[in-house]
């Protein structure tokens, strides 16, 4: 018997942004899905527009496990995680131990297939690059949505994360920020009003 997927299913109980007042709570499972979608998109954008060779499906798969250790450790808020180099190193060590524990839960017959999903390997470096960018992007987009809802508690985090995202030297990230990010600051009515209307098909005269 393996507890691996039973633990992963508990992502939905891991609350993010624990020290912040949220207009809506975001759990780890929701965040993970969004990161997977954005990582896939970044890979596609790089390939189609910037002559990249990233595997979009691989990036999405890696993203599904990018915070897997938090089902054991919980979400450690950024101010604590980055308080000092010593604490940052300790956090990385704890995360590594948690990932090893999850990995050990897998049946031996399939364990090697999951290892690259739980531990970064050089062969997947291009895919992990877009996953990490997507992770940062999604944190910024959460802040944008909170500010749109009138929650100024996220204003400072939004400013810091925007600066961090803009400093990522990946053209696909800049494209995503310009093309997709502005819509996250809009209400549903605004999205509906600005949505391009489908063109009516031209009927041929008999």
Q: What spans do the regions from the language model cover?
A:
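Alpha-helical, largely C-terminal catalytic domains
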Residues: 1-206
């Amino acid at each position: 018997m393996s507890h691996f997927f039973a633990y992963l299913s508990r992502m939905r109980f891991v609350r993010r942004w624990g020290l912040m007042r949220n207009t809506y709570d975001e759990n780890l499972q929701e965040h993970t899905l969004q990161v997977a979608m954005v990582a896939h998109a970044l890979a596609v954008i790089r390939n189609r527009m910037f002559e990249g060779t990233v595997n979009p499906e691989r990036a999405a798969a890696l993203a599904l496990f990018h915070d897997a250790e938090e089902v054991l450790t919980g979400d450690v808020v950024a101010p604590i995680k980055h308080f000092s180099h010593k604490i940052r190193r300790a956090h990385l060590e704890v995360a590594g131990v948690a990932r090893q524990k999850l990995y050990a839960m897998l049946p031996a017959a399939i364990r090697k297939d999951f290892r690259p999903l739980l531990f970064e390997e050089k062969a997947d470096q291009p895919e992990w690059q877009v996953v990490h960018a997507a992770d940062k992007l999604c944190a910024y987009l959460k802040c944008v949505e909170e500010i749109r809802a009138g929650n100024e508690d996220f204003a400072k985090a939004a400013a810091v994360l925007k600066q961090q995202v803009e400093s990522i030297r990946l053209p696909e990230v800049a494209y995503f920020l310009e093309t997709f990010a502005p819509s996250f600051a809009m209400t549903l009515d605004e999205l509906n009003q600005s949505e391009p209307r489908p063109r009516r098909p031209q009927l041929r005269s008999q």
